[in-house]
Design a protein with these regions (language model features):
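N-terminal beta-alpha lobe that positions the nucleotide/phosphoryl donor
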Residues: 1-172, 176-179
Length: 179
């Protein structure tokens, strides 16, 4: 079977939380402090390294945030991370600094084999970070971003789709701290 569109490396880099973090860092896109973990002991070590709660648990290779969540203490961290490790196709979770309350903005991006790329649509989640996108009220186009911030996120989305070598469409989500 021939895979059309994205190659497997692109899919891995987009879906593996640790690889994606490194991709973003490699093209100077800011990312939250985070540690990839494959065991509960690594999760606890990551929490100690980050040093504060709440923490976000993000399983790799799952749909709809399955197995993830926000932990406000060590007990919740162990419980959520255990489920995340089970749900992840590769047994990996990313333990991340919480950005609860930040705004979530999404960009639908298309790119063809000739490297023509366009932002098809922008969306803004009316609910703050912490409410899963699938359960949030979303409006299109964005309503509250300044043009400067929109252009910055637009450029970042285009930079990312090109770096990941995605051919076709993708959804890029950003967290924006309200000033």
């Amino acid at each position: 079977v021939e895979l059309i569109g994205c190659d497997l490396a692109s899919i891995d880099e987009a879906e593996d939380r640790d690889l994606f973090k490194r991709v973003c860092e490699g093209i100077d896109l800011p990312v939250c402090e985070a540690v990839a973990c494959s065991s509960i002991q690594e999760v606890l070590d990551a929490a100690d390294k980050i040093g504060k709660y709440p923490l976000l648990i993000r399983p790799a290779f799952t749909l709809g945030g399955l197995g993830g969540g926000t932990a406000f203490n060590k007990g919740e961290l162990v419980e959520i991370a255990s489920q995340g490790l089970l749900q992840s196709a590769i047994g990996q979770v990313l333990i991340e600094v919480s950005i609860l309350g930040w705004q979530e903005h999404e960009y639908e991006v298309m790119r063809d084999a000739a490297d023509n790329a366009i932002i098809v649509c922008t969306m803004e989640n009316l609910d703050p970070m912490g409410v899963h996108t699938g359960e949030s009220v979303v409006v299109a186009p964005q309503q509250t971003l300044s043009d400067r911030d929109h252009q910055m996120l637009r450029d970042a989305a285009l930079k990312l789709i090109r770096r990941l070598n995605i051919k076709g469409g993708c959804n890029v989500q950003f967290a924006v701290e309200q000033s």
